[in-house]
UniProtKB/Swiss-Prot annotation:
GO molecular function, one term: quinone binding
PROSITE patterns named among the record's database cross-references: COMPLEX1_ND1_1, COMPLEX1_ND1_2
One example of a Gene Ontology biological process annotation: photosynthesis, light reaction
Lineage summary: Eukaryota, Viridiplantae, Streptophyta, Embryophyta, Tracheophyta
Organism: Nandina domestica
Name of protein: NAD(P)H-quinone oxidoreductase subunit 1, chloroplastic
Amino acid sequence: MIIDTTKVQQAINSFSRSESLKEVYGLIWLLVPIFTPLLGIIIGVLVIVWLERQISAGVQQRIGPEYAGPLGILQALADGTKLLFKEDLLPSRGDILLFSLGPSIAVISILLSYSVIPFGYHLVLADLSIGVFLWIAISSIAPIGLLMSGYGSNNKYSFLGGLRAAAQSISYEIPLTPCVLSISLLSNSSSTVDIVEAQSKYGFWGWNLWRQPIGFMVFLISSLAECERLPFDLPEAEEELVAGYQTEYSGIKFGLFYVASYLNLLVSSLFVTVLYLGGWNLSIPYIFIFIPELFRINEVCGIFGMTIGIFITLAKAYLFLFISITTRWTLPRMRMDQLLNLGWKFLLPISLGNLLLTTSFQLLSL
């Protein structure tokens, strides 16, 4: 039997011109901007886990992971695969609906925060005029998932851990908000893209780090507390609460809490970069003027400039990650009363005073 290649080619061409194939292409190009950042975020979390293991090994003067891949870089992937195949146990007298929804709410609410983060020039999922406040609103949902997990477990340790997570989030979300308000006042915008571009004019000296040093320190401490990292990991203190709200969990649901923790750490690092460290911009004054010109030359130059922006953003974010990981293995855990006193009696008055000073200077400069 001889195949007529001409007819086959005609059939392929007619299929490629069909409306159904155009709809498939449209759907693919619609999903690409969504799944590309998602893949990047997952890779970023894997790198954070590897970095934490290596840094903790160095601090404790021991050898870190070295068997799963070169230099142990696949260790996090191996741990996730192990948890994926473990049995998913459910508490016999717990609320199964709340128990199952808790980890999902914690992860999804943090993933939504990435939609307003500019990774580079023209590289943001949603450039909203209320970008930073949307992040604050969305990040307030995650403790609800932790509280649901603790309550649905029907375990006293889990419930206490959920209550601690909610109390800690409220205590440090409030001082963090005036710091963001101060940055919005300086930039005359609440858009994350506008905030980055407002820091671009004078290069390194235009960063909000130098104009808001007090706000930067308050934001840094509040971000660590929001991520529940040592010395602020009271909701899952092993010596007091076994594992806190995670006590009754196993399998992939248990792994989701760790994913949420590292996702939150990465998003906090990126917001420190965007708000205080100039985002995707280099430390060269007026360099931002030439970035749009790269896109006008040709697409290759534009993609090259965008890649450099992504690299700069991640380099600054991983600097904050290094500080937070080192802090975890350096400082001891605080008591619950010390944690609340630090948030309500120390950080909140300082952040409000910083906001008052910023508002006064902005009014005087009009």
